Design a protein with these regions (language model features):
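An exposure/low-complexity boundary signal
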Residues: 2, 20-23
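An acidic-aromatic pocket/loop used at catalytic or ligand-binding sites
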Residues: 23-186
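Bacterial N-terminal signal peptides
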Residues: 9-19
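Bacterial N-terminal signal peptides that target proteins for export
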Residues: 1-10
Length: 186
């Protein structure tokens, strides 16, 4: 009996062990986002279950009009499990301040590699980030107030991406959006 299970059991065990560092890293990132949600000056605007995506567009450059269509100057298309969160930042705190705290933790605690960052006008059009990239029109703010960070975590075969976007329409309307994409391993 044992010999018939062994060929099936060993590859499954090896697969699970190879994904263990990714699961730990992803779990830590989700814990970090949960810490954000639990802060008293944060109100959740949108949070859905993880969804499987194919060829999800990750911006690695400013959004600009190229041959009549809005798109990032540089990008990558990735597939995997995507989790999105959008929060409104309240009580005099700024979305940029919260973004910088999260970014600092990603770099310190997870050795996240920054693949692209922009602030203000260097990001391009805020309305395009809100509508085309994140499909959250509530994120539309002034171009000068926006910030975006794209991070890579993990190693080939067990990677994830974390995207952070902060915007502000006014002092009272500050928003932060986060996306975590756990990549397929093929």
């Amino acid at each position: 009996m044992r010999t018939t299970l062994f060929p099936w059991y060993l590859p499954l065990t090896l697969l699970l062990l190879s994904r263990a560092p990714l699961a730990a890293e992803a779990g830590g990132v989700f814990d970090l986002l949960e810490e954000v949600r639990q802060r008293p000056h944060v109100e959740t605007v949108a949070a859905g279950p993880a969804e499987t995506v194919r060829d999800h567009l990750v911006g690695l450059g400013a959004i600009e009009k190229i041959r009549g269509a809005w798109s990032p100057r540089d990008s990558e298309r990735l597939s995997g499990e995507l989790t999105r969160r959008t929060w409104r930042i309240l009580d005099g705190f700024s979305s940029a301040e919260v973004l910088e705290r999260i970014a600092g933790r990603l770099e310190q605690d997870f050795a996240a590699q920054l693949t692209f960052a922009c602030e203000g006008y260097s990001c391009g059009s805020s309305v395009q980030w809100a509508n085309r990239m994140f499909r959250q029109r509530i994120l539309y703010g002034t171009d000068v107030s926006q910030r975006y960070r794209a991070y890579r975590l993990g190693e080939a075969g067990s990677e994830l991406r974390v995207l952070l976007y902060a915007s502000a329409r006014s002092a009272e309307r500050q928003y932060l959006h986060a996306e975590v994409l756990v990549l397929d391993d093929h």
